[in-house]
Protein backbone atom coordinates (compact mmCIF):
# COMPACT_ATOMS: atom_id res chain seq x y z
CA UNK A 1 0.00 0.00 0.00
CA UNK A 2 1.15 3.55 -0.60
CA UNK A 3 2.61 5.41 2.32
CA UNK A 4 2.29 8.88 0.88
CA UNK A 5 1.76 11.33 3.67
CA UNK A 6 -1.18 13.62 4.11
CA UNK A 7 0.97 16.60 3.31
CA UNK A 8 2.14 15.20 -0.03
CA UNK A 9 1.91 17.40 -3.11
CA UNK A 10 0.69 14.39 -5.11
CA UNK A 11 -3.06 14.72 -5.86
CA UNK A 12 -5.05 12.11 -3.95
CA UNK A 13 -6.35 10.44 -7.12
CA UNK A 14 -2.77 9.90 -8.41
CA UNK A 15 -1.61 8.31 -5.17
CA UNK A 16 -3.26 4.87 -5.71
CA UNK A 17 -1.52 2.40 -8.00
CA UNK A 18 -3.23 0.73 -10.96
CA UNK A 19 -3.85 -2.39 -8.89
CA UNK A 20 -5.42 -0.32 -6.11
CA UNK A 21 -7.77 1.33 -8.59
CA UNK A 22 -8.72 -2.05 -10.06
CA UNK A 23 -9.50 -3.44 -6.60
CA UNK A 24 -11.63 -0.42 -5.78
CA UNK A 25 -13.51 -0.54 -9.09
CA UNK A 26 -14.26 -4.24 -8.53
CA UNK A 27 -15.83 -3.50 -5.15
CA UNK A 28 -17.68 -0.52 -6.63
CA UNK A 29 -19.12 -2.60 -9.46
CA UNK A 30 -20.23 -5.37 -7.12
CA UNK A 31 -21.96 -2.98 -4.74
CA UNK A 32 -23.64 -0.80 -7.38
CA UNK A 33 -25.02 -3.78 -9.29
CA UNK A 34 -26.04 -5.44 -6.02
CA UNK A 35 -28.11 -2.33 -5.32
CA UNK A 36 -29.85 -2.56 -8.69
CA UNK A 37 -30.81 -6.19 -8.17
CA UNK A 38 -32.18 -5.56 -4.70
CA UNK A 39 -33.91 -2.19 -4.98
CA UNK A 40 -35.79 -2.91 -8.19
CA UNK A 41 -38.02 -5.16 -6.08
CA UNK A 42 -39.11 -2.19 -3.95
CA UNK A 43 -40.67 -0.60 -7.04
CA UNK A 44 -42.67 -3.62 -8.22
CA UNK A 45 -44.24 -5.01 -5.05
CA UNK A 46 -47.75 -3.77 -5.92
CA UNK A 47 -47.95 -5.48 -9.37
CA UNK A 48 -46.46 -8.69 -7.92
CA UNK A 49 -49.20 -8.76 -5.27
CA UNK A 50 -51.80 -8.22 -7.99
CA UNK A 51 -50.50 -10.95 -10.32
CA UNK A 52 -50.26 -13.67 -7.69
CA UNK A 53 -53.39 -12.55 -5.82
CA UNK A 54 -51.65 -12.16 -2.46
CA UNK A 55 -51.92 -9.33 0.10
CA UNK A 56 -49.26 -6.63 -0.11
CA UNK A 57 -47.99 -7.53 3.35
CA UNK A 58 -47.04 -11.00 2.04
CA UNK A 59 -44.98 -9.42 -0.72
CA UNK A 60 -43.20 -7.26 1.86
CA UNK A 61 -42.39 -10.52 3.65
CA UNK A 62 -40.31 -11.50 0.59
CA UNK A 63 -38.34 -8.30 1.06
CA UNK A 64 -37.99 -9.07 4.78
CA UNK A 65 -36.67 -12.60 4.25
CA UNK A 66 -34.21 -11.33 1.63
CA UNK A 67 -32.76 -8.94 4.21
CA UNK A 68 -32.56 -11.61 6.91
CA UNK A 69 -30.74 -14.00 4.58
CA UNK A 70 -28.11 -11.32 3.98
CA UNK A 71 -26.67 -12.05 7.41
CA UNK A 72 -26.06 -15.71 6.51
CA UNK A 73 -24.36 -14.73 3.26
CA UNK A 74 -22.26 -12.03 4.91
CA UNK A 75 -21.06 -14.30 7.72
CA UNK A 76 -20.05 -17.08 5.33
CA UNK A 77 -18.44 -14.70 2.84
CA UNK A 78 -16.58 -12.84 5.59
CA UNK A 79 -15.09 -16.09 6.87
CA UNK A 80 -14.06 -17.11 3.34
CA UNK A 81 -12.62 -13.66 2.62
CA UNK A 82 -10.49 -13.77 5.77
CA UNK A 83 -9.26 -17.29 4.99
CA UNK A 84 -9.03 -17.43 1.18
CA UNK A 85 -8.83 -13.80 0.09
CA UNK A 86 -11.24 -11.02 -0.85
CA UNK A 87 -11.55 -11.65 -4.59
CA UNK A 88 -13.07 -15.13 -4.86
CA UNK A 89 -16.04 -14.54 -2.49
CA UNK A 90 -16.75 -11.29 -4.34
CA UNK A 91 -17.07 -13.10 -7.68
CA UNK A 92 -19.16 -15.92 -6.22
CA UNK A 93 -21.55 -13.43 -4.62
CA UNK A 94 -22.09 -11.47 -7.84
CA UNK A 95 -22.85 -14.63 -9.82
CA UNK A 96 -25.15 -15.83 -7.04
CA UNK A 97 -27.38 -12.77 -6.77
CA UNK A 98 -27.48 -12.26 -10.55
CA UNK A 99 -28.86 -15.70 -11.34
CA UNK A 100 -31.24 -15.67 -8.36
CA UNK A 101 -32.79 -12.49 -9.74
CA UNK A 102 -33.17 -14.15 -13.13
CA UNK A 103 -34.92 -17.09 -11.47
CA UNK A 104 -37.21 -14.72 -9.58
CA UNK A 105 -38.21 -13.04 -12.83
CA UNK A 106 -39.25 -16.40 -14.28
CA UNK A 107 -41.24 -17.46 -11.20
CA UNK A 108 -44.33 -19.56 -11.98
CA UNK A 109 -45.72 -19.16 -8.46
CA UNK A 110 -45.43 -16.79 -5.53
CA UNK A 111 -43.70 -19.52 -3.49
CA UNK A 112 -41.03 -19.90 -6.18
CA UNK A 113 -40.50 -16.13 -6.17
CA UNK A 114 -40.25 -16.16 -2.38
CA UNK A 115 -37.53 -18.84 -2.42
CA UNK A 116 -35.56 -17.22 -5.28
CA UNK A 117 -35.46 -13.84 -3.55
CA UNK A 118 -34.56 -15.45 -0.22
CA UNK A 119 -31.58 -17.13 -1.89
CA UNK A 120 -30.71 -13.82 -3.54
CA UNK A 121 -30.31 -12.41 -0.04
CA UNK A 122 -27.43 -14.80 0.61
CA UNK A 123 -25.52 -13.59 -2.44
CA UNK A 124 -26.37 -9.98 -1.71
CA UNK A 125 -25.04 -10.25 1.83
CA UNK A 126 -21.94 -12.08 0.64
CA UNK A 127 -20.89 -9.25 -1.68
CA UNK A 128 -20.42 -6.50 0.90
CA UNK A 129 -17.80 -7.90 3.34
CA UNK A 130 -15.53 -9.13 0.55
CA UNK A 131 -15.94 -5.96 -1.51
CA UNK A 132 -15.57 -3.54 1.40
CA UNK A 133 -12.42 -5.24 2.71
CA UNK A 134 -10.94 -5.40 -0.80
CA UNK A 135 -11.53 -1.69 -1.43
CA UNK A 136 -10.61 -0.27 1.97
CA UNK A 137 -7.48 -2.40 2.47
CA UNK A 138 -6.25 -1.50 -1.00
CA UNK A 139 -6.85 2.24 -0.76
CA UNK A 140 -4.33 4.80 0.62
CA UNK A 141 -5.07 6.24 4.08
CA UNK A 142 -5.40 9.94 3.33
CA UNK A 143 -8.46 9.66 1.05
CA UNK A 144 -10.00 6.49 2.49
CA UNK A 145 -12.91 8.37 4.10
CA UNK A 146 -13.87 10.06 0.84
CA UNK A 147 -13.63 6.86 -1.19
CA UNK A 148 -15.61 5.02 1.47
CA UNK A 149 -18.37 7.55 0.86
CA UNK A 150 -18.13 7.09 -2.91
CA UNK A 151 -18.26 3.30 -2.54
CA UNK A 152 -21.20 3.13 -0.15
CA UNK A 153 -22.98 6.00 -1.87
CA UNK A 154 -22.91 4.01 -5.07
CA UNK A 155 -25.79 2.01 -3.63
CA UNK A 156 -27.71 5.15 -4.52
CA UNK A 157 -26.45 4.92 -8.10
CA UNK A 158 -27.67 1.33 -8.29
CA UNK A 159 -31.05 2.37 -6.88
CA UNK A 160 -31.19 5.28 -9.33
CA UNK A 161 -30.42 2.87 -12.15
CA UNK A 162 -33.29 0.61 -11.09
CA UNK A 163 -35.60 3.65 -10.89
CA UNK A 164 -34.50 4.73 -14.36
CA UNK A 165 -35.14 1.25 -15.73
CA UNK A 166 -38.51 1.20 -14.00
CA UNK A 167 -39.53 4.60 -15.33
CA UNK A 168 -38.53 3.88 -18.93
CA UNK A 169 -38.94 0.13 -19.33
CA UNK A 170 -41.76 -0.99 -17.06
CA UNK A 171 -44.53 0.40 -19.28
CA UNK A 172 -43.18 -0.97 -22.59
CA UNK A 173 -42.48 -4.37 -20.99
CA UNK A 174 -45.95 -4.52 -19.49
CA UNK A 175 -47.45 -3.74 -22.90
CA UNK A 176 -45.93 -7.03 -24.12
CA UNK A 177 -48.27 -8.88 -21.81
CA UNK A 178 -49.64 -8.75 -18.27
CA UNK A 179 -46.90 -9.39 -15.74
CA UNK A 180 -43.98 -8.77 -18.06
CA UNK A 181 -43.38 -5.38 -16.48
CA UNK A 182 -42.21 -6.68 -13.11
CA UNK A 183 -40.73 -9.86 -14.61
CA UNK A 184 -38.61 -7.87 -17.05
CA UNK A 185 -37.29 -5.69 -14.24
CA UNK A 186 -36.05 -8.77 -12.38
CA UNK A 187 -34.65 -10.52 -15.45
CA UNK A 188 -32.45 -7.47 -16.12
CA UNK A 189 -30.73 -8.37 -12.85
CA UNK A 190 -28.73 -11.15 -14.50
CA UNK A 191 -26.49 -8.65 -16.31
CA UNK A 192 -24.15 -7.97 -13.32
CA UNK A 193 -22.73 -11.49 -13.77
CA UNK A 194 -20.63 -10.09 -16.62
CA UNK A 195 -18.58 -8.08 -14.09
CA UNK A 196 -16.98 -11.29 -12.82
CA UNK A 197 -15.01 -11.68 -16.04
CA UNK A 198 -13.29 -8.34 -15.47
CA UNK A 199 -12.64 -9.06 -11.77
CA UNK A 200 -11.14 -12.46 -12.56
CA UNK A 201 -8.68 -10.96 -15.07
CA UNK A 202 -7.60 -7.67 -13.49
CA UNK A 203 -8.09 -7.67 -9.71
CA UNK A 204 -5.41 -8.72 -7.19
CA UNK A 205 -5.61 -9.32 -3.45
CA UNK A 206 -4.74 -6.37 -1.14
CA UNK A 207 -1.10 -6.37 -0.01
CA UNK A 208 -2.04 -6.07 3.66
CA UNK A 209 -4.14 -9.26 3.49
CA UNK A 210 -1.45 -11.14 1.53
CA UNK A 211 1.23 -10.17 4.06
CA UNK A 212 -1.02 -11.04 7.00
CA UNK A 213 -1.74 -14.45 5.48
CA UNK A 214 1.98 -15.12 5.04
CA UNK A 215 2.58 -14.32 8.71
CA UNK A 216 -0.25 -16.64 9.74
CA UNK A 217 1.18 -19.46 7.61
CA UNK A 218 4.73 -18.87 8.87
CA UNK A 219 3.73 -18.83 12.54
CA UNK A 220 1.16 -21.59 12.00
CA UNK A 221 -1.43 -19.49 13.83
CA UNK A 222 -4.86 -18.73 12.43
CA UNK A 223 -8.11 -17.31 13.74
CA UNK A 224 -10.31 -20.35 13.23
CA UNK A 225 -13.49 -18.70 14.56
CA UNK A 226 -13.25 -15.01 13.64
CA UNK A 227 -16.91 -14.36 14.47
CA UNK A 228 -16.33 -15.34 18.10
CA UNK A 229 -13.13 -13.31 18.26
CA UNK A 230 -14.97 -10.01 17.76
CA UNK A 231 -16.96 -10.66 20.94
CA UNK A 232 -13.86 -11.00 23.11
CA UNK A 233 -13.34 -8.29 25.72
CA UNK A 234 -10.84 -6.37 23.58
CA UNK A 235 -13.41 -5.82 20.81
CA UNK A 236 -16.74 -6.21 22.63
CA UNK A 237 -17.63 -2.50 23.03
CA UNK A 238 -16.54 -1.88 19.46
CA UNK A 239 -18.80 -4.68 18.27
CA UNK A 240 -21.75 -3.58 20.42
CA UNK A 241 -21.66 0.06 19.29
CA UNK A 242 -21.11 -1.02 15.69
CA UNK A 243 -24.12 -3.34 15.80
CA UNK A 244 -26.30 -0.59 17.30
CA UNK A 245 -25.10 1.85 14.65
CA UNK A 246 -25.89 -0.53 11.79
CA UNK A 247 -29.26 -1.59 13.23
CA UNK A 248 -30.34 2.05 13.38
CA UNK A 249 -28.81 2.71 9.97
CA UNK A 250 -30.85 0.01 8.24
CA UNK A 251 -34.03 1.04 10.04
CA UNK A 252 -33.56 4.64 8.88
CA UNK A 253 -32.96 3.54 5.31
CA UNK A 254 -35.98 1.28 5.01
CA UNK A 255 -38.23 3.66 6.91
CA UNK A 256 -37.45 6.16 4.14
CA UNK A 257 -37.35 3.96 1.05
CA UNK A 258 -39.06 0.59 1.57
CA UNK A 259 -42.64 1.73 1.10
CA UNK A 260 -42.05 5.09 -0.56
CA UNK A 261 -43.08 3.89 -4.01
CA UNK A 262 -46.20 2.20 -2.64
CA UNK A 263 -47.08 5.29 -0.58
CA UNK A 264 -46.73 7.63 -3.54
CA UNK A 265 -48.78 5.39 -5.85
CA UNK A 266 -51.53 4.21 -3.53
CA UNK A 267 -52.06 7.27 -1.31
CA UNK A 268 -50.92 10.23 -3.39
CA UNK A 269 -51.98 8.77 -6.74
CA UNK A 270 -48.64 9.09 -8.53
CA UNK A 271 -47.94 7.19 -11.75
CA UNK A 272 -44.91 4.87 -12.09
CA UNK A 273 -43.13 7.54 -14.12
CA UNK A 274 -43.78 10.13 -11.38
CA UNK A 275 -42.57 7.77 -8.66
CA UNK A 276 -39.33 7.27 -10.56
CA UNK A 277 -38.49 10.99 -10.20
CA UNK A 278 -37.88 11.21 -6.40
CA UNK A 279 -36.41 7.70 -6.38
CA UNK A 280 -33.96 8.51 -9.16
CA UNK A 281 -32.90 11.98 -8.05
CA UNK A 282 -33.02 11.08 -4.38
CA UNK A 283 -30.47 8.36 -4.99
CA UNK A 284 -28.26 10.54 -7.16
CA UNK A 285 -28.19 13.04 -4.29
CA UNK A 286 -27.52 10.16 -1.87
CA UNK A 287 -24.39 9.33 -3.86
CA UNK A 288 -23.25 12.96 -3.80
CA UNK A 289 -24.07 13.40 -0.10
CA UNK A 290 -22.28 10.19 0.82
CA UNK A 291 -19.20 11.28 -1.13
CA UNK A 292 -19.27 14.75 0.45
CA UNK A 293 -19.64 13.61 4.06
CA UNK A 294 -17.09 10.86 3.49
CA UNK A 295 -14.65 13.55 2.41
CA UNK A 296 -15.58 15.70 5.41
CA UNK A 297 -14.63 12.80 7.69
CA UNK A 298 -11.00 13.39 6.71
CA UNK A 299 -11.30 16.89 8.20
CA UNK A 300 -13.68 16.64 11.16
CA UNK A 301 -13.37 12.95 12.01
CA UNK A 302 -15.49 9.89 11.36
CA UNK A 303 -18.01 10.44 14.15
CA UNK A 304 -18.85 14.09 13.53
CA UNK A 305 -19.14 13.52 9.77
CA UNK A 306 -21.96 11.09 10.52
CA UNK A 307 -23.65 12.76 13.49
CA UNK A 308 -23.99 16.26 12.03
CA UNK A 309 -25.93 15.45 8.82
CA UNK A 310 -28.17 12.89 10.54
CA UNK A 311 -29.08 15.23 13.38
CA UNK A 312 -29.98 17.98 10.89
CA UNK A 313 -32.01 15.60 8.72
CA UNK A 314 -34.47 14.91 11.58
CA UNK A 315 -35.92 18.40 11.10
CA UNK A 316 -37.12 17.64 7.56
CA UNK A 317 -38.91 14.33 8.18
CA UNK A 318 -42.28 15.62 9.47
CA UNK A 319 -42.32 18.29 6.76
CA UNK A 320 -41.95 16.14 3.64
CA UNK A 321 -44.22 13.39 4.98
CA UNK A 322 -47.01 15.89 5.63
CA UNK A 323 -46.74 17.41 2.16
CA UNK A 324 -49.04 16.16 -0.60
CA UNK A 325 -48.23 18.70 -3.33
CA UNK A 326 -45.81 16.94 -5.74
CA UNK A 327 -43.59 19.98 -6.25
CA UNK A 328 -43.18 20.73 -2.55
CA UNK A 329 -42.73 17.05 -1.75
CA UNK A 330 -39.88 16.77 -4.24
CA UNK A 331 -38.17 19.96 -3.04
CA UNK A 332 -38.26 19.10 0.67
CA UNK A 333 -37.44 15.44 0.11
CA UNK A 334 -34.36 16.33 -1.95
CA UNK A 335 -33.18 18.73 0.77
CA UNK A 336 -33.69 16.00 3.36
CA UNK A 337 -31.62 13.55 1.29
CA UNK A 338 -28.73 16.06 1.13
CA UNK A 339 -28.21 15.39 4.84
CA UNK A 340 -29.53 11.90 5.54
CA UNK A 341 -27.73 10.66 2.42
CA UNK A 342 -24.48 11.00 4.37
CA UNK A 343 -25.43 8.41 6.97
CA UNK A 344 -23.88 5.52 5.00
CA UNK A 345 -20.71 7.32 3.95
CA UNK A 346 -18.39 5.48 6.32
CA UNK A 347 -19.96 2.02 6.42
CA UNK A 348 -17.01 0.42 4.57
CA UNK A 349 -14.30 2.72 5.92
CA UNK A 350 -15.21 3.01 9.59
CA UNK A 351 -16.12 -0.65 9.99
CA UNK A 352 -12.88 -1.72 8.27
CA UNK A 353 -10.82 0.60 10.48
CA UNK A 354 -12.39 -0.74 13.67
CA UNK A 355 -11.02 -4.30 13.26
CA UNK A 356 -7.65 -5.95 12.46
CA UNK A 357 -6.83 -7.72 9.21
CA UNK A 358 -7.31 -11.31 10.47
CA UNK A 359 -11.02 -10.77 11.12
CA UNK A 360 -11.83 -7.62 9.13
CA UNK A 361 -14.15 -9.12 6.52
CA UNK A 362 -15.96 -11.35 9.03
CA UNK A 363 -16.37 -8.53 11.54
CA UNK A 364 -17.50 -5.90 9.05
CA UNK A 365 -19.81 -8.37 7.32
CA UNK A 366 -21.50 -9.49 10.53
CA UNK A 367 -21.82 -6.06 12.13
CA UNK A 368 -23.15 -4.52 8.93
CA UNK A 369 -25.62 -7.24 8.03
CA UNK A 370 -27.02 -7.93 11.47
CA UNK A 371 -28.39 -4.44 10.96
CA UNK A 372 -30.23 -5.75 7.92
CA UNK A 373 -32.12 -8.18 10.16
CA UNK A 374 -33.47 -5.25 12.17
CA UNK A 375 -34.19 -3.36 8.97
CA UNK A 376 -36.11 -6.38 7.69
CA UNK A 377 -38.86 -5.71 10.21
CA UNK A 378 -39.49 -2.18 8.97
CA UNK A 379 -41.53 -2.81 5.78
CA UNK A 380 -43.97 -5.30 7.37
CA UNK A 381 -44.43 -3.04 10.40
CA UNK A 382 -45.05 0.01 8.23
CA UNK A 383 -47.55 -1.98 6.15
CA UNK A 384 -49.28 -3.34 9.26
CA UNK A 385 -49.87 0.12 10.74
CA UNK A 386 -50.67 1.70 7.37
CA UNK A 387 -53.12 -0.97 6.16
CA UNK A 388 -54.28 -3.10 9.08
CA UNK A 389 -54.51 -0.16 11.50
CA UNK A 390 -55.71 2.26 8.79
CA UNK A 391 -53.07 4.88 9.64
CA UNK A 392 -51.79 5.36 6.10
CA UNK A 393 -48.06 5.23 5.39
CA UNK A 394 -47.03 8.80 6.24
CA UNK A 395 -47.23 8.62 10.05
CA UNK A 396 -45.58 5.19 10.49
CA UNK A 397 -42.80 6.25 8.11
CA UNK A 398 -42.29 9.48 10.05
CA UNK A 399 -42.15 7.85 13.50
CA UNK A 400 -39.82 5.08 12.31
CA UNK A 401 -37.45 7.48 10.55
CA UNK A 402 -37.14 9.95 13.42
CA UNK A 403 -36.79 7.29 16.10
CA UNK A 404 -34.13 5.41 14.16
CA UNK A 405 -32.17 8.59 13.44
CA UNK A 406 -32.01 9.41 17.15
CA UNK A 407 -30.62 5.94 17.94
CA UNK A 408 -28.18 6.29 15.03
CA UNK A 409 -26.69 9.53 16.38
CA UNK A 410 -26.28 8.03 19.88
CA UNK A 411 -24.60 4.88 18.52
CA UNK A 412 -22.11 6.88 16.44
CA UNK A 413 -21.29 9.11 19.42
CA UNK A 414 -20.41 6.01 21.47
CA UNK A 415 -18.09 4.58 18.79
CA UNK A 416 -14.30 5.03 18.43
CA UNK A 417 -12.62 7.72 16.33
CA UNK A 418 -10.39 6.07 13.71
CA UNK A 419 -9.52 8.89 11.28
CA UNK A 420 -6.07 8.32 9.81
CA UNK A 421 -5.72 4.74 11.05
CA UNK A 422 -3.21 2.66 9.09
CA UNK A 423 -4.24 -0.92 8.34
CA UNK A 424 -1.34 -3.29 9.05
CA UNK A 425 -0.54 -6.96 8.51
CA UNK A 426 0.30 -7.49 12.20
CA UNK A 427 -1.35 -10.39 14.03
CA UNK A 428 -3.56 -8.67 16.60
CA UNK A 429 -6.43 -11.06 17.28
CA UNK A 430 -4.19 -14.12 17.37
CA UNK A 431 -2.16 -12.55 20.16
CA UNK A 432 -5.37 -12.40 22.15
CA UNK A 433 -6.39 -15.94 21.31
CA UNK A 434 -2.97 -17.57 21.72
CA UNK A 435 -0.90 -15.92 24.51
CA UNK A 436 2.83 -15.79 23.87
At which residue positions do the language-model features occur?
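Cytosolic juxtamembrane N-terminal segment immediately preceding the first transmembrane helix
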Residues: 1-36, 41
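Helix-breaking motifs and short loop linkers at transmembrane-helix boundaries and internal kinks
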Residues: 53, 85, 106-112, 140, ...
Amino acid sequence: MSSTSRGSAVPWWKEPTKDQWYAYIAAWLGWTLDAFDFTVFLLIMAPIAQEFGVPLIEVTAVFTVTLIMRLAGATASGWLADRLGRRTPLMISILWYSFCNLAAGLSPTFTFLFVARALLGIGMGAEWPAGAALAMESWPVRSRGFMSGVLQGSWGLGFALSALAYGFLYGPLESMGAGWGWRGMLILGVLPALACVWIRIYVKEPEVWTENKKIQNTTKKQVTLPLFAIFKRKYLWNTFTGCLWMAANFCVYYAIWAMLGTYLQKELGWTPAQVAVPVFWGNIITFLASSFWGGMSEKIGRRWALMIPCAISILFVPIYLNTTDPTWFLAIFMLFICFVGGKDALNPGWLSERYPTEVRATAAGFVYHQGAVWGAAVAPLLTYFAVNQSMGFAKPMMYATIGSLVVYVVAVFLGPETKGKVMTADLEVIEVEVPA
